[in-house]
Amino acid sequence: IQVTGRLQPGPGQQQTVAAVGPSGTGKTVNLVKLAAQFQLQQQCQVGLITADTSQLTSVDQLRTYTDMFQVPLEVVATAREMRRARQQFAGFDLVLVDTAGIRPGDLSAIRVLGSLLVEAGIDEAMLVLNANGSQDSMLEAVEGFGSVGITSLMMPKLGRIRM
């Protein structure tokens, strides 16, 4: 995994970024924060796609946030739906892709995720991990999600851990 700079979408330079990782690491809430930041502070046109349909309450909660920040949301479950959602956001500055939490050892689910990310045409795949997780669990996640082309790492709550 390389250290990458900040996301820098701009007019005519669309960037598509997916958040992947185990359940409960903060993928969804951090994508909402990024969407709001780029939409409100940098006046970027932002679209959000969620492929996390495992719990309807999650989609409803996400829709509440995207409505609040006026960020369009597309919900997808298949590669075909992902292609359609990408077409909906053609011309947007930043497209953020939320994915379902997957156990790093679930290679079948990770292969399906990889196919969805190909259809999304992502530029970056951020692996989202808990900053207070064990070194073993982090290494397992890096290895497990490596096949989807991880380009960066996001560690929410980094400021909350003790050194």
Report each predicted region and the residues it spans.
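Conserved catalytic-core segment of NTP-binding enzymes
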Residues: 59-61, 68, 77-88, 94, ...
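Primarily NTPase-proximal linker/entry elements flanking Walker-type ATP/GTP-binding cores
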Residues: 1-54, 63-79, 83
